[in-house]
Amino acid sequence: YVGGACVKDSTIINGKKIDFAQGATVLGMMPNFIYKETGLSKKIKTFCPENPKLIYFENDNTPTRIFREITLLEKELKDRWNEKGDVKAFRNDENKVIEFIQKIYKEGTPPNLDQAVNEIGKDLTKLWIKGSAKDLLDHYFTSEKTKVYMGMTVIESSPSSYNEKGTSFTIPLMDSGSVFGGYWGFVKQGIWKISDELLELNNELGIETILNSEINDIDTNKGRISYTNNNLDSKIYYDYLLFCTDPLTPT
């Protein structure tokens, strides 16, 4: 199967073939211009819940609601978690960083710190890109529960510690998708439909996709990859080599 982090597998339950996700299950990080310009928006059906997310901590009898509307969110976090920090400033500053990320996505330019300083300023670059997630969350929030919730993407998307430099960037990065305006949603039948449709688009463009292969060697001097495909040893030459997520890591 194709898919990278969104690869699927299948099993038989009560005589019926069932597809299931081996890695990611929700759609969120894709830029909207890719979603539209590739034609994916016309080929798949999606759904993004607009109701507040419900958060439970240990011994909670009722959930804390994560509202999209900032005034409601501020009140909820204050009432439930005794948050005394600046929730509004956090969201506003995060949006500035997200807009920068989305801009360089669209331009197809690799991000760099000098560009970040020019676009969002020295202070936000230090706090939101170069700094640690812990320092970022301590800067805006007082409640440990708020910090745990707002920093969840750091621990779910990498093995890095909150204390490591550069981990603050994970938070806006994981909210930078624009298909659902920074939120996460679902693809009818499963997120692998995205990969399936992209494979069809690639086939229409004449791109060859080689699956079920194991890379044995990469000769960067000769631009050559040696691999085994269906028990046959083969070689392929390249001008540019791009590495994407393998199917096993996210599982």
Each predicted region: which residue ranges?
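A short, glycine/Asx- and small/polar-enriched loop/turn
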Residues: N59-D60, S160-G166, D219-I225, I236
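Short glycine-rich, flexible loops that bind phosphorylated cofactors or substrates
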Residues: T249-T251
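Helical element adjacent to the flavin cofactor pocket in flavoenzyme catalytic cores
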Residues: W128, L173-K222, L232
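N-terminal glycine-rich phosphate/pyrophosphate-binding loop and immediately adjacent elements
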Residues: Y1-F100
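Rossmann-like flavin
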Residues: D60-K165
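Core beta-strand elements of the Rossmann-like FAD/NAD(P) dinucleotide-binding domain
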Residues: T228-Y240, C244
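Short, well-ordered coil/turn residues at beta-beta hairpins
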Residues: H139, C244-T245
